[in-house]
């Protein structure tokens, strides 16, 4: 489309089928009986184009620089915006009002989770908890002797500080930490301590994603997606949910109502077979894009839920190692139309 204005975009018939790059080039397009440009239900490719529910195109406004620097690991939690910029963990009410709260590794991806009104963060080396003031967590290793009254007999249990991991999550009153091929979980309602002799699961490979869904949790590794089914980790079952590995860091959460479930939000992610999926509370993984969008294998990525001007959509940025990111395009509109 040669630089159309917004009025021209809105007057088009639109593409009610959305973006679809899996349709055959020879597929017969329906005659809509109009002289408007679209003569197919599908767009094959779109750059900075939003589509309404009816398929009408809108111009996406591109991007604007908020703050210069090597930035990654963006997170929004408890009404605050978190990001790592040039080795500084920055926090603020929005991207234009940030203050530094910690010095962290410049390159390691940061994982975040909210728990009991605080935001916890960890990258495998640096970790902490942010409330109104910064508190170190989990800190130096310590041991705790805790006594419990069970049947009038005192039992000594050795508790230790939770390990520092590269990925963390909070679910069912416990903190979960992923380190290499091990998934650790804290004591109930005690997110800083665990029994390292019992409070863990062994994983088949390096975990990149921990995402709660209902009483369970999805675990994404290099080789597949697993679902930990059950609220009590001591009786929970670890089941295989999807046979392809997660694209590292390419996951986010969306409102559960979009998938007719009662959860406030559920996880969505990209896997290495080029498919976006949602993890439902039952442990079912539902593919969202396989029948209409084919994506090549990517090395890493990022996702975010974008809600603007009445449109709610998941925005993904996917890259191969060393490839330039073409998701941040300038203010332009490009659409590829198949004519028959």
Kindly give the residue locations of the regions a language model identified:
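N-terminal beta-propeller domains
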Residues: 1-97, 143-232, 317-339
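Repeated scaffold domains used in trafficking and secretory/extracellular systems
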Residues: 66-75, 103-117, 149-170, 204-212, ...
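Hydrophobic beta-strand segments of well-ordered beta-sheets in folded domains
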Residues: 80-81, 117-119, 312-315
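Pre-catalytic or accessory/regulatory segments outside the catalytic core
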Residues: 83-84, 89-122
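Short acidic-glycine loop/turn motifs at beta-strand connectors
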Residues: 85, 92-95, 123-125, 130-133, ...
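Beta-propeller fold detector
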Residues: 98-103, 137-150, 194-199, 236-242, ...
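Hydrophobic or amphipathic alpha-helical targeting/insertion segments
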Residues: 111-149
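Beta-sheet-dominated scaffold domains
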Residues: 205-340
